[in-house]
Amino acid sequence: MSRKKNRLTGVDALNEAFDAVDHQPLLDHLGVDIQRDLLVLALTHRSFANENGMLPNNERLEFLGDAVLGLSVANKLYEQYPSSPESDVSKMRASIVSRYGLADIAREIDLGNHILLGKGELLTEGRSKDSILADTTEALFGAIFRQHGFETARDVILRLFAYKIDNASARGIHQDWKTTLQEELAQRKRPMAEYSATSVGPDHDLVFTAIVTLEGEEMGRGEGPNKKLAEQEAAHQAFRKLRESRA
């Protein structure tokens, strides 16, 4: 009996958190309607689900959306760059659908304010983490696919990623944010950025946190399953901050 009560309490908390935000602007950005149950699921991060009675979370939709995204972008690149070798279009796709590319799209549609996060993630600014933004974006694509089918999901994806796809060749076949940040600093005649990293968790499931500093000031922070990816995320945040400040 108490187990059922806890479950209902979790569902009530889920509905209350979801209804506290107007999600219509997000749907307007996407250009499609998503039925309530799918939208709730797509926006429910595992931290919220775990803190409220082990509710369903968006990871299965993320898995599905990742597949739809990959195929949509791969086919578009195949058509748009007919003379590029497989190795180049493969790297273009990897850059476009990377965590950083997805997080950029998420920020453009203000996705962070719509994600249902647990208290721990809220305290650590989870709404601005590239990993959470990227995963939730893929979950939304999965939800659109489930409701509307592949063609509609593909059209939404290609519209959101149009600029990145059109400029994939011009930007180069990969994006190394540490190099990009250093080039920006060199252009401004600023000193080199410095990186530090720590890890937590068991050996088989370590989570790395990297911090990039410039002249003693923290410019970016990133997380990842290894030091390299964490530093890339931190460098990406630092690059955006530098561009925004025009320091």
Swiss-Prot record:
The active site is at residues 66, 138. Keywords: Cytoplasm, Endonuclease, Hydrolase, Magnesium, Metal-binding, mRNA processing, Nuclease, RNA-binding, rRNA processing, rRNA-binding, tRNA processing. Residues 21-149 form the RNase III domain. It catalyses: Endonucleolytic cleavage to 5'-phosphomonoester. The keyword Nuclease applies. Its EC number is 3.1.26.3. Mg(2+) binds at residues 62, 135, 138. Homodimer. Digests double-stranded RNA. Involved in the processing of primary rRNA transcript to yield the immediate precursors to the large and small rRNAs (23S and 16S). Processes some mRNAs, and tRNAs when they are encoded in the rRNA operon. Processes pre-crRNA and tracrRNA of type II CRISPR loci if present in the organism. HAMAP family: RNase_III. This is Ribonuclease 3.
